[in-house]
Amino acid sequence: MAAAKWLIASLAFASSGLAFTPEDFISAPRRGEAIPDPKGELAVFHVSKYNFDKKDRPSGWNLLNLKNGDISVLTTDSDVSEITWLGDGTKVVYVNGTDSVKGGVGIWISDAKNFGNAYKAGSVNGAFSGLKLAKSGDKINFVGYGQSTTKGDLYNEAAAKEAVSSARIYDSLFVRHWDTYVGTQFNAVFSGALTKNGDKYSFDGKLKNLVQPVKYAESPYPPFGGSGDYDLSSDGKTVAFMSKAPELPKANLTTSYIFLVPHDGSRVAEPINKRNGPRTPQGIEGASSSPVFSPDGKRIAYLQMATKNYESDRRVIHIAEVGSNKPVQRIASNWDRSPEAVKWSSDGRTLYVTAEDHATGKLFTLPADARDNHKPEVVKHDGSVSSFYFVGSSKSVLISGNSLWSNALFQVATPGRPNRKLFYANEHDPELKGLGPNDIEPLWVDGARTKIHSWIVKPTGFDKNKVYPLAFLIHGGPQGSWGDSWSTRWNPRVWADQGYVVVAPNPTGSTGFGQKLTDDITNDWGGAPYKDLVKIWEHVHNNIKYIDTDNGIAAGASFGGFMVNWIQGQDLGRKFKALVSHDGTFVGSSKIGTDELFFIEHDFNGTFFEARQNYDRWDCSKPELVAKWSTPQLVVHNDFDFRLSVAEGVGLFNVLQEKGVPSRFLNFPDETHWVTKPENSLVWHQQVLGWVNKWSGINKSNPKSIKLSDCPIEVVDHEAHSYFDY
C-alpha cells in the first residue's frame, strides 16, 4: 500500500508562495470521471501519475465516498482499463487488458468492497471498451466498441497478418484524419450478453456488430468519439448510435444521424433524423451527438446542429419517440447556448444539460417538454463540468469537473441548492499546492463589435504593487475559448508562475458567448478577432498598472498560431518582445492540405478553387506583411499534425531565418496537433517558456524561471545564421 500512496489524496495543506512548475503540472495526479454506484453511496474513478524518475505512468482506480468525500484505493492494477457498475449493489464489471487471448481483453466481475476476489466471465477477441449495461430478463445485455474489419468482425491487431507492402491506396476521402492515415478498419458498436449461472455471470465471447451492416457508417466517430456516441435502453433491448451520414462525403459535410437498432442486431440500424426525412425538422442537416434514452426507453434525446458543413454551429436538444413515426421535437430551440451533453432525470420529466456559458462549462435543467423560448436554469457548482451522473434516483448529480485553478473537482449539485464539495485536487495534491480562485479574474473590454471577455491569471504570491510582464495567450479553434477549465497542454497558470500576468482573450469567433460571436469570424480570421486583440492589449497597456506590456510576449496554438503569425506582420507585432507560434497556418493556399474540408469551406465561404480569394485574404506570407517581421519568434510544428502539415512550420522558419529574425524551430516527430507525451511536454515547456523568458527579461528578474539551457536536447546549429544578402 505504501507504494500506492499517490493514488490517495494527501493531507490538505495551507497555500504557499511556491511556484507551479512544468514538472508539477505534468506529474500531478490525473483523475477521470467519478461514476456513482446505483445506490449513490460510492463512486469509482481512474487515476494516474507520471513519474519523471522512473519514466512511467502507473495507474489505478479509486473509490470516492459520496457522503464524506473520503478516497480509498480500489486497485493499483494498471491493466484494468475500465470499470462499470453491474447494477447489483456494489458489484462491478471491469475490462483487463491482459488476457489469454492474444490482443484481446478479459471481462471480469468483482465487488467494490472485495475487489481482489474477482472472477473472469470471459474474453473478447480484440481491443474493446466503453461498456454500457442493462438487465434484460435473466441476462445482462451490454454494448461497447472496438475496431471492425470490413467483414464485420472485431479487429485484433495482434492477430492481423503483416502486410507485404506499405502502400496505401485511396479512391475517396479521408486520406488521413487528425493524426492517422485512414485504413480499412473502422469503429463499430458491438453487442453481447452476460449470462447468469448460479451466482456468477459468464460471457460466451460472441459479439454482434451493430454498425457494419449500414454501409459506410462508423460509430463512435473518430478522433474524439467515445461511449457518448451510443446508448443502451434500460430494458437492454434497443441501442442508439451516432454515425456521420453514410451517403454523404464525410470530409466535406458534418451531417450525422442517430440510428436505432435492436440489441441482438435482428434488424439493420435505421436513422431517426435522416436529412430531409419525414421525422426530421425542416432545415436540420448538421452534426448529431449525445443520444440518450429516457428511463422508460420510450423516448430518445439527442443534440443536433442545423448547418451541414459547420462543426461549431449551435446544438439544439431534440426528442424523438422510439418505435413511432411522429416528428422529432425541438426543445428550447431559441436558447442561445450550445448544449454539449444531455441526460434524463429518473422520472423522465426533466433534462439536465451541460453548455458553455461565458467561458464556464455549466450545468442546466429544463423540462423535457420545454417550449422554444424556455431558458434553462443554472445548477450551482464550482468550475466547469466535465461529466455528471445522477446520485441514485435523486435529483442530485455527481459532477466531475475542473477549473483554471484545479485539475479535479468532485462535487454534488442539486437544483435550487448550494453545491456540496467532496474533493478538490488543489487542496490535497502537493503538486497543485497554492493554486486557487483568488488569482483569477475576468476582464471585459469593448472589442471591434461588442464587449469581449478575457481571463486574467496572476502568479503565485501576486503583489499588486509590483509589475509583471504580459503573457498574451491566444486560443485555438478558432471557434473555441479560454474557459474556466484545466488544460493539460496550454495551462495559463504554468505561464503565470514563471513571473507573468497572463491575459487570455476570447475574441470574435469564441464559443459560449452567443452564437453570433462564434459565427462572426467566418471569412474574417484576421479582421475582427485581430481588432479585438488590439483593443484588449491597449486596455491592458493603458489601465492595468501591474502589467508590463513593454516586455510582454504573445503565444498561441492552431488558430492562435495563425494569429501570432498574422500579428508578426502587423503593428501589434512590434509591441511584443517575443512570439510563439505552435501549429499555425502560414501560407493561405496551404489550407487545402488539411483533412476536414468542411472546416475551411465553411470558414472561408467556399471551396479552395471557387473562393480562392478568401483563402488568400488572410495569408500571413504576403510580402508586404513579411517585410515588417522583426520580433523574435519560436515556431513549433509536429510531424503527425495532419490538420496542417509540418511544412507550414518549416516554411515559416525558413522565412524568419532568411529575414534575419531571431528564431528557433521546435519539432516532435512523434507528436500530433498537440504535445501529449510527458517527456516531450517537459521539453516543450522548457523551450517555449525558456524562449519567452529570455526575451521578456524574466530570466533576469526571476532566477528560478526556466531557461533555454535547462533543456537537455542538443540544438542543431550548422551555421552562424541563414541570412545573407542576395
Curated annotation (Swiss-Prot):
Gene Ontology cellular component annotations, sorted alphabetically: extracellular region
Compartments where located: Secreted
One Pfam family, short name: Peptidase_S9
EC code: 3.4.14.-
GO MF term set: aminopeptidase activity; serine-type endopeptidase activity
Single Gene Ontology BP annotation: proteolysis
Keyword entries, A-Z: Aminopeptidase, Glycoprotein, Hydrolase, Protease, Secreted, Serine protease, Signal, Virulence
Position of the signal peptide: 1-19
Keyword Secreted: yes
InterPro entries linked to this entry: 6-blade_b-propeller_TolB-like, AB_hydrolase_fold, PD40, Peptidase_S9_cat
Organism superkingdom: Eukaryota
Glycosylation sites: 96, 252, 605, 699
Residue span of region Disordered: 269-291
Location of the active site: 558 (charge relay system), 641 (charge relay system), 673 (charge relay system)
PANTHER family, per the entry: DIPEPTIDYL-PEPTIDASE 5-RELATED, SERINE PEPTIDASE S9 FAMILY MEMBER
Protein role: Extracellular dipeptidyl-peptidase which removes N-terminal dipeptides sequentially from polypeptides having unsubstituted N-termini. Contributes to pathogenicity.
Stated family: Belongs to the peptidase S9C family.
Protein name (Swiss-Prot/TrEMBL): Probable dipeptidyl-peptidase 5
Naturally occurring in which organism (per UniProt): Trichophyton verrucosum (strain HKI 0517)
